[in-house]
Each structure stands twice: as C-alpha cells, then as structure tokens.
C-alpha cells in the first residue's frame, strides 16, 4: 500500500517477517531497505546471531531500517526482551537517500505493530550495545 506523502509501498513480506520475529521469535533481527518505490526485506538474522553480527550487516554508506529483538536481564534478575526499531542513516550516505528514508520512516514504522523502542543512528557509536541496553531498561 503506497503512502501518498512519500509514495512508498511496504512489501507484505516485511510485515509477515516482523510478525514472525515478534510472535515466534524466528529471527533476532530484520534489516529492510528501500528498493525503488517499496520497502523490502534485505536480511533476516537467525536467533543465534548477536548484536555485533547485526551491526556488521548494516552498510557503512547506505541507509537502512532495522528491527532488533533485544534480550536482557533486569536488575531484579528477570529475563525480558524489547523490540527496537533502528533508523540507520550514516553521515556518509547520499543526501537524497537520507531524505527518502527520513520521509518514509514513520509510515513504515506504523506498519510494524509492536515496536517498543525507536533509535536513530548516523554512526555506529549512536547505536552501541551500551546505548541499546540503557534504552531497554
């Protein structure tokens, strides 16, 4: 379904894979990219992959959207998880690409029901594991 403001469509597979991550925990993360006029799934991370694996898949010079299922233990020793939405927009990416991703982000995020934390990052330090942990608690 295209968005009148950005003209961007969201491929059904994006929503289906997100539901599998959320409900079945089939994936640790999903990386999405804009391909022409639609958002598509680029990479599915297996449950065994960790945060470093995830960040290594993000291209250094191109924007991406991603969701990451972060498991953590609270101060009370309770196991929890939170689903992060990450808008990756490196400083080195093209201005036009950054504009397209920025204008489509909210519309795309609304398609993924169950996002608990949103994070925007322009370089790896803005989405370090320490930042993810602090935002989860």
UniProtKB/Swiss-Prot annotation:
Limits of the ADF-H domain: 7-137
Keyword Phosphoprotein carried by entry:
yes
Q: Name one GO biological process term.
A: pollen tube growth
Report whether Phosphoprotein shows up as a keyword of the record: yes
| Residues bearing the modification Phosphoserine | 6
> Where does the UniProt entry say this protein principally localizes?
cytoplasm
Q: Which CDD domains match?
A: ADF_cofilin_like
* Gene3D superfamilies linked to this entry: Severin (3.40.20.10)
Tell me which positions the record assigns to the signal sequence: none
Q: Look up the domain of life of the source.
A: Eukaryota
| The entry's keywords | Actin-binding, Cytoplasm, Cytoskeleton, Phosphoprotein
Any idea which GO molecular function terms this record carries? actin binding
Q: Output the Pfam families linked to this UniProt entry.
A: Cofilin_ADF
Q: Which GO terms describe its cellular component?
A: actin filament; apoplast; cytoplasm
**Where expressed (tissue)?**
Specifically expressed in pollen.
Per the entry, what this protein does is: Actin-depolymerizing protein. Severs actin filaments (F-actin) and binds to actin monomers.
Query: What family, per the record?
Result: Belongs to the actin-binding proteins ADF family.
What is this protein's record name? Actin-depolymerizing factor 12
Species: Arabidopsis thaliana (Mouse-ear cress)
The gene coding this protein: ADF12
